[in-house]
């Protein structure tokens, strides 16, 4: 595929999604598909929850525009459409967690039975021996679908973060697939980014605060499901493009945040789904950073971790078990910092004060 053709298609997806999201936000306000401020949500006014619907519309436009061969594309669109619909209903009417979990489980089973997408192997994470899962792989796949959806849902706490982290994951997968010759799957990843960008622009208020939109559960569910579908498509089979352990690096920050916060909640005797303000973005902001700075820092950290995974995938000289050990070390470092968040926050504030004093005491140079 020519690069110019690919760029023109991505620009078309971006423009279509931009127009769609402006139209969708007007409809959302009329039908009450909006987010209202409460004790946990500090935004002002009602915000349309149309980010996810717009991303899905952009992806449908992409597949209608092109003739890429994507295995089981129709099944993906049906499954994703159901999840987006249920997510939108939850955004509007607040559906119970149990109903959403059942729907996600049914979709996962359909994906495994019809598309034959499931975890059959975790690769060579124990040295020269491949870890083949057998029938247990189906149960692990069910958990992986649920985990991916909830991991991306949990990071949707400050402006731009869900869009930034998901774009990092899709960019990492897209680069690996593009240079591996899997151009159709790569374009799917890049199209997701093109469809997410208009949401990021409006969510951050780049085009004006009055046009602000949120992703909503429909969007976080769509993104998590698409990520796990692509990872199952590309990490399994004899000729897989991505090693299973690399998938951990590609979704590192959402995965680490979900595991860490659920562990803390369970230790306190709380439900793992109970809301709190202990996510990574809350802790970074508690250290003295603004919402925008936290978005940039966390997205940059995700890009660095994903970059490590992509580099290792291409180098071929780093064994998979070494990459797993390095990931676990990164996870334990993350857990250590989160557990001692107040110390980390105090250290960062001290450094920031010292830098401010140095700038203030620096003599002005005149010609």
UniProtKB/Swiss-Prot annotation:
Keyword Manganese: yes
Main location: membrane
Pfam families, sorted: Glycos_transf_4
UniProt-listed CDD domains: GT_WecA_like
GO biological process: cell wall macromolecule biosynthetic process; cell wall organization; enterobacterial common antigen biosynthetic process; lipopolysaccharide biosynthetic process; O antigen biosynthetic process
PANTHER family, per the entry: PHOSPHO-N-ACETYLMURAMOYL-PENTAPEPTIDE-TRANSFERASE, UNDECAPRENYL-PHOSPHATE ALPHA-N-ACETYLGLUCOSAMINYL 1-PHOSPHATE TRANSFERASE
Identification of the protein by name: Undecaprenyl-phosphate alpha-N-acetylglucosaminyl 1-phosphate transferase
């Amino acid at each position: 595929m020519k690069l110019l053709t690919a760029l023109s298609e991505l620009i078309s997806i971006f423009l279509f999604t931009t127009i769609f999201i402006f139209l969708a936000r007007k409809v959302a306000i009329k039908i009450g598909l909006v987010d209202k401020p409460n004790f946990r949500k500090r935004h002002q006014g009602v915000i349309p929850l149309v980010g996810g619907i717009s991303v899905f519309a952009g992806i449908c436009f992409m597949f209608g525009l092109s003739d890429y061969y994507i295995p089981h594309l129709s099944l993906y669109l049906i499954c994703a459409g159901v999840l987006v619909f249920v997510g939108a209903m939850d955004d509007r009417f607040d559906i119970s967690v149990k109903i959403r979990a059942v729907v996600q489980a049914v979709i996962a089973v359909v994906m495994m039975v019809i598309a034959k997408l499931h975890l059959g192997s975790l690769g060579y994470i124990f040295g020269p021996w491949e870890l083949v899962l057998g029938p247990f792989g189906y149960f692990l796949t069910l958990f992986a679908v649920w985990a991916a959806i909830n991991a991306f849902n949990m990071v949707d706490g400050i402006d731009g973060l869900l869009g930034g982290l998901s774009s990092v994951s899709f960019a990492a997968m897209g680069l690996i697939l593009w240079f591996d010759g899997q151009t159709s799957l790569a374009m799917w990843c890049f199209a997701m980014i093109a469809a997410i960008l208009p949401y990021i622009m409006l969510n951050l208020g780049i085009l004006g605060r009055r046009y602000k939109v949120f992703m909503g559960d429909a969007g976080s569910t769509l993104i998590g499901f698409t990520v796990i579908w692509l990872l199952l498509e590309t990490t399994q089979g004899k000729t897989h493009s991505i090693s299973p352990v690399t998938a951990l690096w590609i979704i590192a920050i959402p995965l680490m945040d979900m595991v860490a916060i659920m562990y803390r909640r369970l230790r306190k005797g709380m439900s793992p789904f109970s809301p709190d303000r202990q996510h990574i973005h809350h802790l970074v902001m508690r250290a003295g950073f603004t919402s925008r700075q936290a978005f940039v820092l966390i997205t940059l950290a995700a890009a660095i971790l994903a970059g490590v995974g992509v580099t290792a995938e291409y180098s071929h000289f780093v064994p998979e078990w070494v990459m797993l050990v390095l990931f676990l070390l990164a996870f334990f470092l993350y857990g250590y910092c989160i557990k001692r968040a107040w110390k980390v926050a105090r250290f960062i504030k001290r450094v920031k004060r010292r830098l401010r004093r140095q700038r203030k005491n620096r003599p002005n140079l005149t010609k």
